[in-house]
Design a protein with these regions (language model features):
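Active-site proximal loop and beta-alpha junction motif in alpha/beta enzyme cores
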Residues: 1-77, 83-317
Length: 317
C-alpha cells in the first residue's frame, strides 16, 4: 500500500488496438483495497473510460480481485479491463504462471496468458451462453437506432439478448454501411434496454461473405458515454449468437470482431464459443493490452465506509 493513503498508482493502457489511435483506453488502479463504489465511479468519470480496481481476493484460490467501473455504476464484468489488469500485473512481476484465477462480482474467472517477445496475449474465459426469450421486434430496434426502415435489419437472423456474463442485445444488420450510419436516440435506446433487461445494444454486420469477420458497434446503457470502442463482453455474446444461429456446428467457433472504427479507435477482438448438442457451453475472448503510462493519482474524497473487495450485488446491470 502506498505511503499516502489518498494516493494510488494508476497504469494507463489501451486494449484490442488495431492500428494507430485504436483500442479501448483502460486505467488500472493498483492497491485499491478500501476504495468505495463512489470513488470508483468518480475515477471512471475523471478518466472517461472503464476503470479497473485491483483488490485483494477473499477466495483462497484467487490470486487477486478486480472491480470494474464506468462513470455511472459498477459492472459485473469487463473483459478488456481484465486483459489490461493481467497485462499490468504481469509487467510488475506479480503474475508468473498461467492460468490465473481472478475474483469478480460474478465469481471466479480463469484467465490464460502467453508471452510473445515483449508482449503477452490474454484469453479471458466467460460463461455458458444464455439466450433471452423476451426480445424487442425489428421495428422497435430500428426506431432507437435511427434506421428509417426495419428492413435494414436482417430477417433471417433473430434479434436476441445474449449473456455470457452480462446481457447484450445482438442486432443483425444488412451491411457495414448501415452499421456505420447508425445515429441512435440514446434516451429511447436506454429505455428499450430497461424494458428488456439488457445492458446495451450490439448491432453487427458481416465484413465479407464466407469469412468469420464481423464489424460491430456497442451502445451501452447509461454508462456515462454513448459508445464503446471495443467490448469484450459484447463480442463474446456475439460469438455465442453466431455459433448458435449462424454457424450451427459443434466444437469451437472463432470469430474476429472489428469495432471502434466510426469512433476513430480501430479495434480487433477474437471471440470464441464452444457449441455442443444445441447449446453454447463455453466462451472466451482473446486480445492484447499496451501499457501507455503510469501516474500517481489523488483519490476522490470518501466520506463513507465500504469494503473495497468484490461483493455480490454490488454491480448494477
Amino acid at each position: 500500500m502506498p505511503g499516502n493513503a489518498n494516493i494510488r498508482t494508476v497504469v494507463h493502457t489501451t486494449v484490442f488496438s488495431d492500428g494507430v489511435g485504436g483500442g479501448n483506453p483502460c486505467p488500472v488502479v493498483l492497491d485499491a483495497d478500501g476504495l468505495v463504489s463512489e470513488q470508483g465511479m468518480q475515477l471512471a468519470a475523471r478518466f472517461m473510460a472503464e476503470t479497473i480496481l485491483v483488490v485483494s481476493a477473499k477466495a483462497s484460490e484467487a490470486s487477486f480481485g478486480l472491480r470494474y467501473f464506468v462513470p455511472r455504476h459498477e459492472m459485473e464484468m469487463c473483459v478488456h479491463g481484465t486483459i489490461a489488469a493481467v497485462t499490468v500485473l504481469h509487467s510488475l512481476g506479480e503474475i508468473a504462471t498461467s492460468p490465473v484465477r481472478i475474483e469478480t462480482v460474478l465469481g471466479l474467472i480463469s484467465v490464460e496468458w502467453s508471452r510473445q517477445n515483449e508482449q503477452i496475449t490474454v484469453t479471458v474465459s466467460q460463461f455458458a451462453a444464455e439466450f433471452s426469450k423476451r426480445n424487442p421486434d425489428a421495428a422497435e430496434v430500428a426506431q432507437v437506432l435511427g434506421l428509417y426502415e426495419a428492413s435494414l435489419i436482417r430477417a433471417d437472423l433473430p434479434i436476441v439478448s445474449v449473456s455470457t456474463s452480462r446481457q447484450k442485445l445482438i442486432v443483425p444488420l444488412q451491411s457495414v454501411q448501415t452499421l456505420d450510419c447508425l445515429r441512435p436516440n440514446y434516451e429511447a435506446l436506454w429505455s428499450l434496454c430497461d424494458r428488456y433487461g439488457t445492458t446495451g445494444l450490439y448491432p453487427f454486420a458481416p465484413v465479407s461473405k464466407g469469412e468469420d469477420i464481423y464489424a460491430a458497434r456497442q451502445f451501452p446503457k447509461r454508462a456515462g458515454y454513448e459508445e464503446d470502442p471495443a467490448t469484450g463482453v459484447a463480442a463474446c455474446a456475439l460469438a455465442a449468437y453466431l455459433a448458435q444461429y449462424h454457424s450451427k456446428k459443434d466444437g469451437w467457433n472463432s470469430f474476429e470482431i472489428l469495432q471502434g472504427r466510426t469512433m476513430g479507435r480501430p479495434s480487433r477482438l477474437v471471440a470464441q464459443a464452444l457449441a455442443q448438442d444445441g447449446s453454447i457451453r463455453e466462451t472466451k475472448v482473446t486480445g492484447k493490452a499496451e501499457i501507455l503510462s503510469r501516474e500517481s493519482c489523488q483519490l476522490p474524497s470518501n466520506n463513507a465506509f465500504e469494503s473495497g473487495r468484490p461483493q455480490a450485488g454490488a454491480a448494477q446491470r
